[in-house]
């Protein structure tokens, strides 16, 4: 089959498209070793120099990488570690320990994970230690090859660093920072957090042992730079096997970046959230629409992707509810309007629902109370309402306080798209306090 095809609906070899999907998906999921860093070159230089001082010179360091979610904190540290490990003398000696505050929720779990990642389970064996500090010191001592100069440097990466600060006594942080200040095994402690006030969470003894180095990532690029990132992220590399297809794909990407509809889509996304994560999500959804019969991305693909990105998941759930459940949500909406967002209980919702039935005199909505209760519990299972306190065994379910997790705009927009919604139910939703 000839590679010289027109841009229309001409057939493209499936293997070629498969390679495109693989390359771009790896890039969008931050799994590609060749992806670029955008707008953080200064921060990257600072971080790599700090890591080299630990790995090559045996100097202990600590630093916090601070920035909002999606700003590239993980990508920054991964790129720095990749470059560091390409140095032969470093790759043979430096050890890495990756911890996450969502997974290592206490000191014992963290210590077990450190032992596992350092491959020291056999060394520890059945030894009993008096304290966390003693155990950690033993692990690092086991890595020594004689003197400090020959010790294996260890790089600790603590993701969700602020969650470690909420652990009891901050024992893990204290001991890691204490070691980084002492003359023991050279270590680098790298914390990743989205909390700008992270230092306020640290105890005085922990703060005194921290170097107070911070690297801030703030997504400071403007829209023209954002458009440049869009083109770079969607372009195929020069080494792509099918040169003709790569050239046409990149020409199509260039024309997309100049399309007014595409620029409008990207401007909206930029105004709401200019993190690369949100851009990658948009491009990933658009890429899913590329097929053998539709081999080039279009503005329509990006518009559909934007629509999917902006979908309200809770409003979408409403479309699948029964009329009874819709009625209960409307009753809760009115209770919110009356009591100004104060919590309510099932009995209050049921009474409001009964007013509607009596006003309309519709026997079609006259369900037994246990049936209404079942519908109310289903809304709770769908997390459209949430209990305000933990349910006790002896408490009556109908008097348990709950809160509606939908606002009026979400409810009204969902009702507009709700198929076969009875007219009187729709009118009830738009009515004011006059129903009382």
From Swiss-Prot:
Top-rank taxon, per record: Eukaryota
Q: Which residues carry this modification: N6-methyllysine?
A: 7
Q: Its encoding gene is what?
A: ORC4
UniProt binding sites for ATP: 67-74
Principal place of residence:
nucleus
For the biological process aspect of GO, one term held by this record is: DNA replication initiation
Q: Which family does it belong to?
A: Belongs to the ORC4 family.
Assembly with partners or alone: Component of ORC, a complex composed of at least 6 subunits: ORC1, ORC2, ORC3, ORC4, ORC5 and ORC6. ORC is regulated in a cell-cycle dependent manner. It is sequentially assembled at the exit from anaphase of mitosis and disassembled as cells enter S phase. Interacts with DBF4. Interacts with POLQ.
**What is the name of the protein in this document?**
Origin recognition complex subunit 4
> Could you tell me what this protein does?
Component of the origin recognition complex (ORC) that binds origins of replication. DNA-binding is ATP-dependent. The specific DNA sequences that define origins of replication have not been identified yet. ORC is required to assemble the pre-replication complex necessary to initiate DNA replication. Binds histone H3 and H4 trimethylation marks H3K9me3, H3K27me3 and H4K20me3.
Listed InterPro entries: AAA+_ATPase, ATPase_AAA_core, ORC4, ORC4_C, P-loop_NTPase
One family from Pfam that matches here is ORC4_C
Where, subcellularly, is it found?
A: Nucleus
Record-level GO cellular component terms: nuclear origin of replication recognition complex; nucleus
Give the keywords, sorted: ATP-binding, DNA replication, DNA-binding, Methylation, Nucleotide-binding, Nucleus
Q: Give one GO molecular function term.
A: nucleotide binding
Q: Which SMART domains match?
A: AAA
């Amino acid at each position: 089959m000839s590679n010289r095809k027109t841009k229309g609906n001409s057939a493209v070899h499936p293997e070629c498209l498969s390679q495109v999907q693989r390359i771009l998906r790896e890039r969008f999921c931050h799994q590609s070793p060749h992806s670029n860093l955008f707008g953080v070159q200064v921060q990257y230089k600072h971080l790599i120099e700090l890591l080299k001082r630990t790995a090559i010179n045996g100097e202990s360091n600590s630093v916090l990488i601070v920035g909002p979610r999606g700003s590239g904190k993980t990508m920054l540290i991964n790129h720095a570690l990749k470059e560091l490990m390409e140095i032969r003398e470093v790759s043979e000696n430096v050890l890495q320990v990756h911890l996450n505050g969502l997974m290592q929720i206490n000191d014992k779990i963290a210590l077990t994970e450190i032992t596992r990642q350092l491959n020291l389970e056999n060394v520890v064996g059945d030894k009993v230690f008096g304290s966390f500090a003693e155990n950690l010191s033993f692990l690092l001592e086991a890595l020594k090859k004689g003197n400090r100069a020959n010790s294996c440097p260890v790089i600790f990466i603590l993701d969700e660093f602020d969650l470690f600060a909420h652990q009891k006594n901050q024992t893990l942080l204290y001991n890691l920072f204490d070691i980084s200040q002492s003359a023991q095994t050279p270590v680098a402690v790298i914390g990743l957090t989205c909390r700008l006030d992270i230092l306020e969470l640290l105890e005085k003894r922990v703060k005194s042992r921290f170097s107070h180095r911070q690297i801030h990532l703030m997504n400071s690029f403007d829209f023209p730079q954002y458009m440049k990132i869009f083109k770079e992220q969607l372009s195929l590399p020069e080494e792509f096997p099918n040169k003709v297809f790569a050239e046409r794909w990149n020409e199509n990407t260039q024309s997309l970046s100049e399309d007014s509809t595409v620029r409008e889509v990207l401007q909206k996304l930029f105004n709401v959230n200019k993190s690369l994560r949100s851009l990658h999500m948009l491009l990933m959804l658009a890429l899913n629409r590329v097929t053998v019969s539709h081999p080039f991305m279009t503005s329509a693909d990006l518009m559909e992707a934007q629509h999917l990105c902006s979908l309200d998941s809770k409003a979408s759930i409403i479309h699948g509810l029964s009329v009874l459940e819709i009625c209960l949500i409307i009753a809760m909406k009115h209770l919110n309007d009356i009591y100004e967002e104060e919590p309510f209980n099932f009995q209050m919702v049921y009474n409001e629902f009964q007013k509607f039935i009596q006003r309309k005199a519709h026997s079609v909505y006259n369900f037994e109370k246990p049936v209404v209760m079942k519908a109310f519990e289903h809304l709770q299972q769908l997390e459209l309402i949430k209990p305000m306190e933990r349910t006790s065994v002896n408490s009556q379910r109908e008097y348990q306080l709950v809160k509606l997790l939908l606002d009026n705009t979400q409810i009204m927009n969902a009702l507009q798209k709700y198929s076969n919604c009875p007219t009187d139910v729709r009118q009830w939703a738009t009515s004011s306090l006059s129903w009382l």
